[in-house]
């Protein structure tokens, strides 16, 4: 980066260039060697300017402010500003760097600024990133760091991470105030420091630094007392109109840092082109008392009026501050009668319940209260006189009085409460608890309160009540309802309800820690279970739910089957009464037999599936149960029970479904008992069922076919068929009458038709 120096510094640079061969090393050494000399000259000039400013300020403070004197002060300040601008522009390493893109318009702006400052050496390079070596401090985030690196490299800059080769340091305000290692190195070498807070807009826009200002430090003035300007003190310009080419037109702005104490602040250098958009800002009371030194070169009359008003406010504040001390002392001894009477009444209300217990004597308290009232009357008289004298005080004084009054009131409360209050802790605690309760109730009544918080508040209230009166806990406990039913009773009722279902046997499974039951079965389909103790387990609940679902499904299936059987029975009876022609041919007989076979097959398959399911559940129950019971426990379907049910079912169906003649009607049940239960059909069925366990279905089909063909019902069918074939066909009387009537009507209709 090409830097401009004063004439003395240029001679030193020329001498160093003649002595050394490498131009790059020469430039680096020259910059490092010239910094101390330039810094000394700059310090001397600035000290001289500061002395002149102090003398002018003392003279101006002694004189009353007027518009003429203000204009004179402004002119002097402008002259000082111009001098400081010249010094800052001559010493580039001390912090005068400017950012704007390399355009012709920016070069014209720079030339105009040089003419304004009357210094040919003030013209600087158009691009601060040209051949720039920068260092990024550790306080900057990694993501922000990479963004800055990309922007600077994109615009021709070179990143360098050693302070000996860098020309700029980029850090944060925090890092600058904490004086990190990089910052201290940059201060020692005189490298300008850029603060990230004034560069961050560039990272977002992904472009060269535009109108947004960045901070450049002149760190060699007073390194020990360096302080950054606040963001309000810095001059920030709004975004100017961008040209169509995408470049930003900007004007050079030189920024500095506060490097001295508050009393001796440096003057910010401001160009006339940017003065129209600037406004003076107040920072501290000291700067408000002193005349403002940072003003524009051309001031408007409105701004002059503002300055006068500020001076008046400063004078009023000084007058008010003089009255502050006296008013505080006077207000410290004054308390109104109303506040004192309210305090005494509140104290008496808290003491009255304790007076009944003979714990507190109010005689001394009354004497003290009377004395306090007399003193307060005297103080109020003085208070009125003082108020007449202090009517012109500001609002800030009134606030301070109120604060002092409140403090004195608190002291008097303590003095009254300390009289014979040895046992008043319980009353104060109760009053505080009542206040807390009222607050909780008020909060609970708001419409936005949720159930969770209301429950918590109620719980807190109950806890507080329980601490005060432990008997509340016994009354607040929930009581059992008189009409309640115990768990054992409910389970026994539920078990009795389930046990009354037809066709199943229920049992109570025992576990060591969950069940002790005595199950008594009372013959037939009605079962009852008496439970002594019962405790649910998760596995038992799941199994019971599955059993109930299976039972409901079985009941529905049985009801459907019974309905179908009733329908078949009704149809058979109607057929016997009305028509006896169902068995006229062998085809009808075969169809009838096939239908019966299919029905029996479906029923047997369902029974087999139920049996297999019961066996699996029985096996599972045997594995899970760990109780040594004398009687073997099984699932609801045992083998004997299923066989007996199937036998009954087949006998009933054979009696209902197969129509028999009245002469040869003989029940299969009697035949079954006469034969001694040695019927071939049932024997084959039960043998196949018991041996195969429901696996071999072909044998069952063959046995069913043989049973139907060999049964007496088949012989009765054959005999009825032979009888029906011999009888002549005669329709019923009703049909004959119907046929005759229709014939007569038709003949009459045709006779009525006209003949052709």
From Swiss-Prot:
Biased composition (Low complexity): 16-66, 75-94, 285-298, 364-401, 422-432
Biased composition regions of type Polar residues, renumbered to the chain: 1-10, 95-113, 514-529, 668-691
One cellular-component annotation, GO: centrosome
Composition bias, Basic residues: 448-459
CDD domains: BRCT
Residue ranges occupied by any BRCT domain in the UniProt entry: 124-216
MF annotations from Gene Ontology: calmodulin binding
Keywords: Calcium, Calmodulin-binding, Nucleus, Repeat
Coiled-coil stretches noted in the UniProt entry, renumbered to this chain: none
Cell location: Nucleus
Region (Disordered): 1-113, 229-251, 272-298, 359-403, 422-463, 514-587, 613-639, 660-700
InterPro entries: ARM-type_fold, BRCT_dom, BRCT_dom_sf
Region described as DEED region: spans on this chain: 537-588
Gene Ontology BP terms: regulation of mitotic nuclear division
Matches recorded under Pfam families: BRCT (PF00533)
Consequences of knocking out this gene: Mutants lacking the DEED domain form multinucleated cells.
Domain of life: Eukaryota
Motif placement: Nuclear localization signal: 464-480
Chain spans, region Calmodulin binding: 495-512, 589-606, 596-613
Residue spans of biased composition, Acidic residues class: 536-587
SMART domains, per the entry: BRCT
Assembly and oligomerization: Interacts with calmodulin and CBPD1 in the presence of Ca(2+).
Name of the protein described by the UniProt record: Nucleomorphin
Native source organism of the sequence: Dictyostelium discoideum (Social amoeba)
Taxonomic lineage from the root: Eukaryota, Amoebozoa, Evosea, Eumycetozoa, Dictyostelia
